[in-house]
Amino acid sequence: MSAIQSTQELLQPIGFDTPVAESKTVLLSPGKEWRARIPAESKLTIKIVYGIAELFGTELANGVEYTIQCANIAVYSVDHVKLEWKSLDELETTVSPDTNMPYLYNLHFALEKMRLSSFDGPRILVVGKASSGKTSLCKILCSYALKSKAYTPIYVNLNPQEGAFSPPGFLTATPISDILDVESTMWGQSMTTGATKLHNKQPMVKNFGLEMIAENRPLYMEVLGQLAQTVDGRLKNDPLVRRSGVIVDSPPLQHLDESYTELEVAITKFNIKTLVVCAPDDSLAVELSDRFQTLVRSIVRIPTSRGICNIDDVARRALQRSQIREYFYGNGSTVLSPYTIGVDLLDAVVWRPKSSLTIDMSKTSPNMVELERVEVTAANLQHALVAITYAPRKSTAEEVFRSGVLGVALITEVNDAKRKMRILLPVPGRLPDKAMILTAYRYLE
């Protein structure tokens, strides 16, 4: 009996203590901002106990926990707010007055006045250098437009290094008809990801496929023009969207050429009327005014917020990886179930954009806007992100280039010997009989 007891004691499971994050409380008076920097592998959970608080313009519900990772956030208190937060990691947090909100309110009310005075809503282009708060401003303007009336502004992302309702590598235009997902690193989920907690958005997607605009400026401006054409079609067919307006988020100015040719193309193609400059002083606004005063009606400067954090290359890579992972697997509150399929290499037709990094421009003058065929091998496609187009598999390079993007897939494995590959799709089903475009982005699970 004692031997049996001793054996049972030996077989008892070993207890592991699950770490529990200690909840901390912050009291915010009206007009204050609570800021937190969340590293790539850390998570932050926040809850508004009482009061009215916003995260980049989206009001946070009382008593609801929000889990956020791989981001820098700023919770703005409209009213007296009690905020609880917890994290297993040590996070850098600060509380300070938000002196920028009066400027944002004035800009929002000016845009609202445009919507009320004309059937053609405001068309604005937000410009600035890297880490100037451009994207945060766009989120706030989109969210405030929804609060005013049942508007549906189109948000246009022209920065291929950051995804908006898509992984990085794409230019997108998305009608914003419902609140944004504050837990998402890419604004929210699109229709291709299936059922989610919040209303899915239906982005218009064009593939650029490269990381840097400088790798192929002619291609970038051609894709930008295609997206603008698609947006114009939506505006003509939807009076509500036309009245709501278009908010265009430009790439950082450091990524453009010295004469800002890409901005000129964006202003012309999207019929921009107002240039919003995010900068700490007037020098940039004056420079852009000299360059574009004949193309736009007005130029407005919004001061750079003191809470803006510089994003280095390591943080940007972490954000891109998080956006790719979220596209297929969801985030903390919305878990998605992607689907892996096996495909014969002979059934895959893959194209890719040309890059100045891989072409000797001194020996040849190729048509940089054309796509080139890719040999389906492990060396070219292993762990690659590919765009599945609407173009049939046997389409020409021109037809594939002009086609829109149906969805994004991840090639997880390529076996050259067996002539097979495995592809991760965001939804169950067979691989569409469509041509694919290889992007410069890779993701290793």
Curated annotation (Swiss-Prot):
Signal peptide: none
BP GO terms, sorted: mRNA 3'-end processing; tRNA splicing, via endonucleolytic cleavage and ligation
Residues reported to bind ATP: 33, 131-136
A GO MF term: RNA binding
UniProt subcellular location: Nucleus
CC annotations in GO: mRNA cleavage factor complex; nucleus
Keywords in alphabetical order: ATP-binding, mRNA processing, Nucleotide-binding, Nucleus
Keyword presence, Nucleotide-binding: yes
Pfam families given in the database record: Clp1 (PF06807), CLP1_N (PF16573), CLP1_P (PF16575)
Subunit organization: Component of a pre-mRNA cleavage factor complex. Interacts directly with PCF11.
Family (UniProt): Belongs to the Clp1 family. Clp1 subfamily.
Known function: Required for endonucleolytic cleavage during polyadenylation-dependent pre-mRNA 3'-end formation.
Name of protein: mRNA cleavage and polyadenylation factor CLP1
Species in which this protein is naturally found: Eremothecium gossypii (strain ATCC 10895 / CBS 109.51 / FGSC 9923 / NRRL Y-1056)
